[in-house]
Amino acid sequence: AHQRPMQAGHVQDRSPSPDQSFARPEQQGGEDIDKPVRPDWFLQLNTYGGKCAFQLETSQTKDGWYTVNIESAPRENPNDPSNKRYLWNKKTVLQMTKSELPILTAVLLGLLPSARFDNHGQNFKCLEVINQGKNFFFKTSGSGLIMHVAPVPTVDAFLYGSMALTQYARNFNGLSTESAMDVISRLANQLFDQGGYKPAEVRK
């Protein structure tokens, strides 16, 4: 049976993860300090499905490299249509490395058919993305972690790809997103021809 694509993604203002280091304003009398001070380039996109949700947001590595985080979380009760809550306290988070970011961008923008990003952190977290034509297949997993699997609408995937492309270009002063797209396209062609990247594992 075919999986129903997830609902269209949209920007959601959700407080960042504990492992994100956005500065918080000093508390003043009676003021609400729940919302962190985010950089002007911060963007967060979400896609919600029947069993889990996926989210991409802009981030920076400890070395200051502009990249994206991929987060996934299970739905609290998939059998209750009225329950729209997702358990972000049980989420899986992966931050794309300097070398992974252009490959993820290539997959999300239709330049590579799939990719696998693994061995992240102590739990050996893994992200797989496959362009299936009608939609994109997303999967996160890891040692001792809940596996999150869902189809993501093509429109959402291209929104994610545009975010990743913009972050990639931001690392190179004066590089336009158009030029960055040309670089990533050339990279994707060579990686595909020479087998220089990890494709997603074949689903059985």
Residue ranges and their predicted role:
Residues A1-K204:
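Positively charged, low-complexity terminal tracts
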